[in-house]
Amino acid sequence: MVVYNVTVSVSPAKSAEWLDFMRLEHVPEVLATGAFRDYKICRVLGYEDGGQTFAVQYVAWSSEHLRRYTEEDAPRLQAAHKNRFGEDAVAFWTVLEVIEEGPAAP
């Protein structure tokens, strides 16, 4: 399993607008590409230096799906995000390979 993790630092003045944008526009557009099976929007807890930090995790169907997404769709979607929020929502991307997962012991 491959997780495409996008960490975004959002200015306090734009946090609510950014969350609405992600929920109503951006995430649906990303999922519409067919590259991902699900997603999570997480708030990073802890020290916040002048804003809020979020992690958006998309679980790819496969490495090939993620490769196609990053080559064919990501540039357009990232540009739309940057055009809308500029320096008020600065993102960086990480690809994670899940090597093991399982349920908690009873």
Please name every model-derived segment.
Residues A13-E17, W61-E64:
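A generic structural signal for alpha-helix starts
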Residues C42, L96:
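Conserved S-adenosyl-L-methionine
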Residues V2-S9, A55-V56:
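Active-site-flanking beta-strand signature of metal-NTP-handling nucleotidyl enzymes
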Residues T7-A13, V44:
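Short strand-loop junctions, especially beta-strand C-caps/beta-turns
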Residues L45-D49:
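A short beta-turn/loop motif at secondary-structure boundaries
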Residues V98-P106:
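Short, low-order "capping/linker" segments at domain edges
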Residues K14-K40, Q78-A79:
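Short amphipathic alpha-helical segments
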Residues T33-R37, Q52, V59-V95:
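An amphipathic, aromatic/His-enriched active-site/gating alpha helix that lines ligand/cofactor pockets
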